[in-house]
Structures are given as C-alpha cells and as structure tokens.
C-alpha cells in the first residue's frame, strides 16, 4: 500500500497510460496509403475515456514523444499552415494529457515548429537533459508533480542525447543533450530532496540497441 498524504494508510490503485511514437496517426485513416488504419489517437481516446469513467483522477495519461511527423496532416500543420494551432498540440490538449516528452523526430521539424508546438501544448513538456546553451538552464521542464488520491507522483522526462549524431545542428541550435544516467541521478536527487514523492515515473524517449555506444552515450541507458 502507498502511504498517502493523509495520516492513514490505504491501498490506492492507479492507472498509468502511455503513448509513444504516434507519428501523426491521429485519425483512423492512413493518408499515405489511402486506407483505414488501426490504432490511432481516435481509438485511444475512446479507451482512455472508458478508463477515466472507472479511475477518475487516479488515471495518468502520458506521451513519450515523436508525434510531430509521420502523416500528411502533420506536414500541413507544421509547414503549410503554421499560423493555425499545431494539430499535435490540439490533439494532446483535447485528450487532456498530463505530461509529454519531446522525441528526436519532433526535434527534426526545427525550432520554429517545435517551439510553437511546445507553447501551444497545455500539459508540461518534459526534457530534463535538454539544456539551453545560452543560459545554461533547462530548455524544457525537467519533471512534473501530480497528486492523485493522496499519492504524490513525480514524472521525470528525458530524450535520447544521440540527436547530434542524426540531425543537422541547425535543427537544434542552442541546445545541449546531456547523457541520461548522470542527468537522471542529478534530477532524482533534486526530486527526492524537494518533492519527496511516493512514486517516480521515468518518461524517456530512448530505445534499445540504437546502434550508438560511446563512452559518453549508451542507447540502452533508459533500460
């Protein structure tokens, strides 16, 4: 059982739902292949809403990045009609996500696109290991805190620091991507000291066997 924020001890059941690598699949139709598509956010929201009816605020909805590219709807929103709210932000806001990380394919769209998207997204955009090189401060919010049914939850977000190996610097100018393990240790100490959470969730946009292993970086770090 969790020790709740109240003085009594009780069993609290939480439901944590996480999406990742949506790649613009918002609607149940593949606009590239021109045929119906399984999955997609249109179906995810039906599932999430059914769980919200059961769990209420004991449900935490998280996204792990790579949402800005993939379908023509994203390209249109990102580059053809950027004056309107970004469709990825609109979907995240409509589905009432609690927190989100940024992925390497989001960075690939360039500053003008992802900076606007970040501003338009209502939930915290997390990235503890992304640093503004001009100010030497976090470019994104490192972590978010949620209190659900007396349980204090910390969500720490990070993304792969291999971005400079894949993307031209013009896409991420002014940013530095720190190694994940040392960054996690640094922020975990801060979270434990300042927040004293009951649970810590790692929301890391990083994979297994990514093909890059150096003294400074290991793609399997999140594991």
Predicted regions: what is each one?
Residues 2-223:
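Acidic, metal/ion-coordinating pockets
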């Amino acid at each position: 059982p969790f020790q709740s924020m109240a003085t009594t001890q009780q069993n609290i059941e939480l439901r944590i739902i996480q999406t990742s690598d949506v790649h613009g699949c918002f609607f149940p139709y593949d606009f590239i292949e021109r045929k119906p598509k399984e999955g997609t956010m249109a179906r995810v929201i039906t599932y999430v809403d059914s769980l919200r009816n059961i769990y209420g605020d004991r449900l935490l909805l998280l996204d792990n990045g790579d949402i800005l590219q993939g379908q023509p709807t994203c390209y249109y929103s990102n580059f053809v009609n950027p004056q309107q709210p970004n469709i990825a932000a609109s979907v995240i806001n409509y589905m009432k996500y609690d927190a989100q990380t940024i992925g390497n394919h989001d960075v690939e769209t360039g500053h003008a696109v992802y900076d606007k998207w970040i501003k338009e997204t209502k939930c915290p955009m997390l990235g503890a290991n992304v640093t503004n090189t001009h100010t030497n401060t976090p470019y994104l919010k490192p972590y978010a805190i949620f209190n659900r049914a007396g349980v204090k939850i910390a969500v720490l977000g990070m993304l792969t620091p291999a971005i400079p190996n894949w993307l031209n610097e013009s896409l991420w100018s002014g940013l530095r991507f720190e190694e994940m393990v040392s960054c996690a240790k640094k922020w975990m100490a801060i979270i434990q000291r300042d927040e004293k959470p009951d649970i810590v969730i790692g929301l890391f946009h990083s994979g297994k066997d990514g093909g890059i292993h150096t003294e400074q970086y290991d793609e399997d770090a999140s594991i």
